[in-house]
Amino acid sequence: MYDRYESPLSSRYASPEMLKLFSMETRIQTWRKLWVALAKAEMELGLPITEEQVQQLEEQVENIDFACAAAREKEVRHDVMAHVYTYGKVAPKAAGIIHLGATSCYVTDNGDLILYRDALLHLRKGLLAVMQNLAAFAKQYRALPTLGYTHYQPAQLVTVGKRATLWLQDFLMDLEELDFVLEHMKFLGCRGTTGTEASFLDLFGGDTEKIDEMNRRIGKTFGFSECYDVCGQTYPRKLDSRILQCLSAIGQSCYRMANDIRLLQHDRQIEEPFEKNQIGSSAMAYKRNPMRCERICSLSRYLMADAANAPMTASVQWLERTLDDSANRRISMPEGFLCADAVLRLAQNVTDGLHVNEKIVAKTVREYLPFIATENLLMEAVKRGGDRQELHEVIRRCSMEATARMKEGESCDLLERLAAEPAFQLNGQDLEKLLKPEDYIGRCPEQVDAFVEKVTPLFKNLKQEKTEINV
């Protein structure tokens, strides 16, 4: 185990469920189930295949001799034929009818479609879990004022909950895209070497209705209601591009959220979970590094970059197909799913344990609120008979002086400066009345309530389990 390379996605980051789904065992069992479905459909539609042969195939689906398959593949240099041979060894009565009329892509491509569909459904649950956590967080802090930033510079007030809805909305868009991909996935079926189904015309004596019915039955067995109308030897590789772009979008949303949390943790406003015995630094014992969010960003970069593989593969299919897609897809597709799974697991863990330091949030608001409130102060002073242009200049001058003082490490004294200006005709009490943070958050609470209400039905049947991360 320690003398050969192992992908960190499998050893450190991805879930046991996703690792099982993309294991060689699941892959070959899926191939065998496809061979069973083919033989059964051919038998039911009149080809000379017996129930005994189909039964023996069904009984041996999980009895896989991987050593035998590896030895055979070394000899014949063909993975599918190696497994046809190995399957026939344990189901000798059916050995002669395995893979009848099919080409390799019958099992490889349909098998991938099944695995990708199941993997997307698994990711969907993780995505919904993150969204549910964020919805609860947004609702909890719907009205807590916090300093908003544009260009990462202090702007107007928002609320902690409203900011979380921005992350939530990104994930909602990802969910919509994922559902679109799932809804439009189709089965390849058993279409022959160039998609013409010529071999089945011979097998079924030219009966095209039987060919269509065979494909319908096989697709239905695996939960697909449609096959692609036309194809070459493979299913359209545009689907791979669509899938990886969907996973990339999830990475983009996770990266954005995690990066925001990292910025806020720097200011000690919000912190990701930190375990009791967790060590932040080998040298600086006091450190509380945002390790989870940093890892989300790191893995998300890989996920976004991985998506570039599929468009290049889809663009070089060469007429009815070429094999130069194979090696790339063996890596880029499973790794994309494993990476998306890892990122969502981390995002679920982080959003389940986000901690808001409300006193620091309030302190930051108090520090900048005098600047934010200057427009309101200006309007109030004008109502009391002041000159708008003169007052604007006073605010500008006092703001610059207060800012210069803050750059020297002193506290903000803008209010005191304005109260001392005769042009304002406002005393300290008047100014304090105009400095209620809740008066500067606009419709944030209302917006949070409306958006959370919109997404809540999505969580109706969600059974969320606490996510543990390995390291």
PLM features: residue spans?
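A helix-coil-helix interface module used to build multimeric assemblies
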Residues: 1-202, 206-217, 280-281, 291-295, ...
